[in-house]
Amino acid sequence: MVKRHIGSWILVLFVVMWSDVGLCKKRPKPGGGWNTGGSRYPGQGSPGGNRYPSQGGGGWGQPHGGGWGQPHGGGWGQPHGGGWGQPHGGGWGQPHGGGGWGQGGTHSQWNKPSKPKTNMKHMAGAAAAGAVVGGLGGYMLGSAMSRPLIHFGNDYEDRYYRENMHRYPNQVYYRPVDQYSNQNNFVHDCVNITVKEHTVTTTTKGENFTETDIKMMERVVEQMCITQYQRESQAYYQRGASVILFSSPPVILLISLLIFLIVG
């Protein structure tokens, strides 16, 4: 009789446990995903232009209340009258007339960074995929990916991309997904840091990038950052589901009961 009651209680606990797990799986995921509302990325069809400005202020691509990519009356991607993707007259990615990436000086050239950095491939060899990269403020280096096949709308750019795609990154830098409110923010940050690091390390070796290279590199890195987000987000929710499963009261009670039966 006692064994029959124990078996009944175990059956009830299993039903409660799996009901709790089912409810956990049906809970909506937080944050806005890709094309699920909130801020969205701009269209892909515009030639040239830096689609990932690093300045704060207005909405996406609208710092200080300017039009799309036109803060303070600049041209397309030309805030304060700078050149292509040159806010405040600096080089590409040089806000306020800065020198190299992240440089505050006014005399350094974009293609002459003052502090050489380790090449991305060397970092990849030194650190396992997903490990924190030293000197990058908590960014991790993703695993290598195949560069996506992208069509740019004309034969010249399509051919140029096929011939030069080996010069563009095949890994991305990123922070953990739980540090971002949605996919757009993750991808924006991922693109900026990856293009920046790849550009600096490549120009240090004496190879420069044209405007066409930068445009294509952003498109390539964007697709890889989206893939990286999807991978990391899936892993994050799987870890969360495991924690919820093994920390739920029915599971704890069931484990305690099994231990009691085994020991007793």
From Swiss-Prot:
Glycosylated residues in this chain: 192, 208
Interaction with GRB2, ERI3 and SYN1: region residues: 25-241
Chief site of localization: membrane
UniProt binding sites for Cu(2+) 3: 88-90
Protein known as: Major prion protein
Self-association state and partner proteins as the record states: Monomer and homodimer. Has a tendency to aggregate into amyloid fibrils containing a cross-beta spine, formed by a steric zipper of superposed beta-strands. Soluble oligomers may represent an intermediate stage on the path to fibril formation. Copper binding may promote oligomerization. Interacts with GRB2, APP, ERI3/PRNPIP and SYN1. Mislocalized cytosolically exposed PrP interacts with MGRN1; this interaction alters MGRN1 subcellular location and causes lysosomal enlargement. Interacts with KIAA1191.
UniProt membrane topology term: Lipid-anchor; GPI-anchor
SUPFAM superfamilies the record matches: Prion-like
Bias (Gly residues): 55-105
Presence of keyword Disulfide bond: yes
